[in-house]
A protein has these predicted regions:
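ATP/pyrophosphate-binding catalytic subdomain of soluble kinases
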Residues: 161-219
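Short, small-residue-biased leader/transition segments that mark boundaries at the very start
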Residues: 2-4
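Thiamine diphosphate
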Residues: 45-121, 175
């Protein structure tokens, strides 16, 4: 069993998104049927990087930013291992950004789990590479002057073949993403949106609860229309180089 009561209680703040994600990962791996002795969970440094301590598998917490490099080595050394890399947005995209893009470019068969809360939590609240422009933090008291990384763009820019995004509080959706990543042969990047309840609470309020997701999130399913809203009454339409929201059934003079 990948989950064991002997592993102790996670040392995360109450309400941290890491709790939700850990439960989803335990459940997904159990449903996939992976064997603990054929699974390795590798992390860097950060709050989310404590996750390997709560896995009844081969597990290793490495040095800051090097989880992708160690994960690559594990997979190349033993191709039969199911390798799961866990990194936060700071660990994975700042000090570990170089390893992140090259693991994707090489298309190594590892699962890269990027837990994105748009903040450095372990070091007490500095802005990260995914913090939005103008974000006020301990290291940017007047607001950041930088534009953030979008992990999906980085992944596709590095010629990635698999990218998925989910919300930590959406257990079923997260589970489906993790199982799809496990079944993909090659580098699979999963971005998990979550709150840091101490230093960046509310950053994903628009999709963090069930009602918010019904209004603002699109569940992409192969062969099905991209609809959202409480009654699936909204869709997306291309407009120039971007997208715009349209309400189904309303006549658009531009497209008649």
């Amino acid at each position: 069993d990948v989950c064991s009561s002997d592993l102790g209680q996670p040392r995360w703040c109450p309400g941290c998104g890491d709790h939700f994600f850990l439960n989803s990962l335990h459940k997904a791996l159990a449903e996939i049927g992976v064997k603990p002795w054929e699974t390795a969970v590798i992390s860097g440094i950060g709050c989310s990087s404590r996750l390997p301590y709560y896995m009844n598998t081969y597990a290793m917490q490495t040095i800051h930013g090097r989880a992708a490099a160690i994960s690559t080595g594990c997979k190349v050394t033993n191709p039969n291992l199911s390798v799961w890399q866990v990194s936060g947005d700071g660990d994975g995209l700042a000090i570990g950004g170089n390893h992140f893009i090259h693991a994707i470019r090489r298309n190594i068969d590892i699962n890269i789990l990027l837990l994105n809360n748009r903040i450095y939590g372990l070091t007490k609240g500095q802005y990260s590479p995914t913090s939005p422009r103008g974000f006020v933090s301990k290291s940017s008291p007047y607001g950041t002057v930088e534009d953030p990384f979008h992990p999906a763009e980085l992944c596709f820019g590095a010629r990635g073949r698999f990218f998925a995004r989910c919300v930590a509080t959406d257990g079923p959706g997260t589970g489906e993403v993790l199982k799809a990543a496990a079944n993909h042969k090659g580098a699979a990047v999963c971005e998990i949106l979550q709150h840091c309840v101490i230093f960046n609470d509310g950053t994903y309020d628009s999709v963090y609860n069930k009602d918010g997701r019904a209004k603002n999130a699109i569940y992409l399913e192969h062969g099905k229309p991209m609809l959202f809203g409480e009654n699936k009454e909204f869709g997306l339409m291309q407009e120039g180089f971007g997208l715009k929201v349209v309400k189904l059934g309303e006549r658009s003079e531009e497209h008649t």
